[in-house]
């Protein structure tokens, strides 16, 4: 019991990291992470531990989680969350699971060999952090531009948007049967 909460603690406190076992104090810097696939959610984790405020956006609609679980209402207000006694209560049967929009290629691209229930775990680890906000349905370069982000006070923008359009190599058999591009997944 309480394995999720212990794991959550260890993402913020690492006694084996002698130089920086705890998250750093607030830096005052605000970072926009565009794209919440594996690169985006991993970068967000490290930026939070460096003391930065992080806003993650993704072009996909991200379904809200229950406020009792995430600590965030659908309107974005922070509320107390209930601790998770057994991580299995977070899991859904993968045959019945509906895509929630969070996770980029890990949500829609990685094969069934990877347990996509882990995306909810990753999302909760981020969303429960006070200096993290998450917005779906926001396309960087369309809905939100660089100028918009700078006007909103972001100090940095991290582009973690993955492979939206494949690069087709101009070589013989570049698209032969069996050759796949990132967007195929």
Label the model's feature ranges:
Residues 33-142, 147, 167-174:
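Beta1-alpha1 glycine-rich phosphate/pyrophosphate-binding loop at the start
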Residues 1-32, 136-185:
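FAD-binding core/adjacent interface of flavoenzyme oxidoreductases
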């Amino acid at each position: 019991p309480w394995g999720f909460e212990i794991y959550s603690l260890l993402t913020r406190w690492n006694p084996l990291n002698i130089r920086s076992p705890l998250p750093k104090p607030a830096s005052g810097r605000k970072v926009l992470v565009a794209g919440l696939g594996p690169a985006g959610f991993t970068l967000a984790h490290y930026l939070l531990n460096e003391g930065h405020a992080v806003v993650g956006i993704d072009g996909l609609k991200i379904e809200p989680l229950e406020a009792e679980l995430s600590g965030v209402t659908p309107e974005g207000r922070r509320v107390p969350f209930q601790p998770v006694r057994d991580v299995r209560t977070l899991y859904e049967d993968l045959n019945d699971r509906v895509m929630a929009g969070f996770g980029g290629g890990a949500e829609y691209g990685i094969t069934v060999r990877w347990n996509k229930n882990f995306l909810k775990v990753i999302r909760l680890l981020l969303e429960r952090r006070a200096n993290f906000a998450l917005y779906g349905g926001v396309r960087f370069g369309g809905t939100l531009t660089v100028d918009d982000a700078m006007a909103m006070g972001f100090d940095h923008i991290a582009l973690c948007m993955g492979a939206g359009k494949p690069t087709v190599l101009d070589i013989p058999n570049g698209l032969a049967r069996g050759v796949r591009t990132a967007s195929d997944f």
